[in-house]
């Protein structure tokens, strides 16, 4: 679809800052490093614009595809309402849409957007909605119905679920290690540790020289 590249860009610029804001909040709460409010506010403004544009494009696609429904719209129709009594992905679609709409409304309200207790909730809703829309709402319905008109519902297997969770876990582990190292360098903790080790070594060397003398 011609709007697909724009939707990918807008949702990426909405989901990415959501994850960054959540990381900033965790850093501010659990480390000595302080993230300025202006940086978080700028990211929240970017999310508001990009999420609103993504929702507008989604609604436009729904109207265009379903206004004069053809066989090409069966995938979207199945995603929204189901086909032939098969509705496995319908809850995923509507939950994604509700998450993004609720998050967008929260971001539109300045009192919520600048409230750092409510802002993480909006970020989680937006990120979850976009993740569902890009996974269960985009990849899977592309194969439903099949080119010959068959409708076969898809259910993630246990192995697929474990692999997905494992990939996310490895990603968060790498991010945690990198953030700990970067924060340690920026705050001077690693430098102080090296200096302390150097001083200990010099003292040990001096004591050994005195003993030899």
Language model: regions and residue ranges:
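Catalytic-face loop-and-helix region of soluble metabolic enzyme cores
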Residues: 108-120, 169
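Extramembrane terminal tails and long inter-domain/linker segments of multi-pass membrane proteins
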Residues: 78, 143-156, 164-213
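Membrane-proximal extracellular juxtamembrane segment immediately upstream
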Residues: 131-146
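Long, contiguous internal "core" modules enriched in hydrophobic/ aromatic residues
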Residues: 1-113, 129, 189-192, 203
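Central hydrophobic cores of alpha-helical transmembrane segments
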Residues: 118-128
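Hydrophobic transmembrane alpha-helical segments of multi-pass transport and channel proteins
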Residues: 128-135, 161, 165-169
């Amino acid at each position: 679809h011609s709007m697909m590249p724009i939707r990918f860009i807008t949702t990426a610029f909405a989901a990415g800052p959501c994850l960054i804001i959540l990381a900033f909040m965790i850093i501010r709460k659990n480390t000595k490093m302080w993230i300025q409010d202006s940086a978080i506010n700028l990211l929240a403004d970017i999310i508001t614009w990009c999420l609103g544009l993504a929702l507008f494009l989604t609604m436009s696609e729904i109207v265009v595809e379903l206004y004069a429904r053809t066989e090409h719209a069966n995938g979207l129709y199945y995603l929204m309402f189901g086909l032939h009594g098969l509705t496995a992905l319908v809850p995923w679609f509507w939950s994604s849409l509700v998450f993004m709409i609720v998050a967008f409304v929260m971001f539109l309200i300045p009192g919520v957007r600048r409230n750092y207790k409510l802002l993480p909730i909006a970020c989680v809703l937006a990120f979850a909605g976009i993740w569902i829309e890009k996974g269960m709402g985009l990849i899977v319905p592309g194969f439903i119905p099949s080119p010959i008109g068959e409708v076969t519902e898809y259910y993630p297997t246990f192995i697929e679920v474990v692999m997905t969770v494992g990939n996310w876990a490895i990603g968060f582990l790498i991010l945690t290690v990198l953030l700990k190292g970067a924060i340690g360098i920026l705050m001077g903790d690693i430098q102080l540790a090296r200096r302390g080790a150097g001083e200990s070594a010099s003292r040990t060397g001096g004591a050994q020289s005195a003993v030899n003398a």
